[in-house]
């Protein structure tokens, strides 16, 4: 199966519906890091093939690892949804790092990086 043909068929069959995909930051749609030019090219082809919304995340919430993808999405004038990976209890006073401030600061970072939408991704 050719995923680009599949995307074209879906777009043709649902021309007025927003299509969304998940993008693993520097890993693209794979499980290893890819060079920046590969990630940019993939985003460009997916955007031009009909993808409207790209949900981007990094499993360690490292915004720099999401930036190439986010920049490529914005260059293609598509919607960028930055997903923040969340687990735990943000209101537990015993949690020294992953508290409410951590997630608010992270949300501000992805907003500054250009995210149109911020999602919380439960890692459970």
Where do the model's predicted regions map?
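Alpha/beta enzyme core
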Residues: 1-18, 24, 28-124
């Amino acid at each position: 199966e050719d995923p680009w043909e599949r995307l074209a068929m879906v777009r043709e069959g649902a021309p007025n519906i927003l299509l969304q995909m998940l993008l693993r930051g520097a890993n693209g749609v794979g499980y290893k890091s890819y060079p920046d030019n590969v990630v940019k090219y993939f985003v460009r082809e997916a955007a031009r093939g009909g993808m409207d919304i790209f949900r981007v995340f990094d499993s360690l919430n490292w915004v720099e690892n999401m930036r190439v993808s986010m920049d490529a999405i914005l260059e293609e004038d598509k919607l960028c949804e930055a997903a923040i990976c969340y687990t735990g209890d943000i209101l537990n006073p015993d949690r020294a790092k992953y508290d409410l401030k951590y997630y608010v600061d992270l949300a501000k970072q992805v907003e500054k990086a250009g995210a149109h939408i911020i999602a919380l991704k439960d890692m459970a």
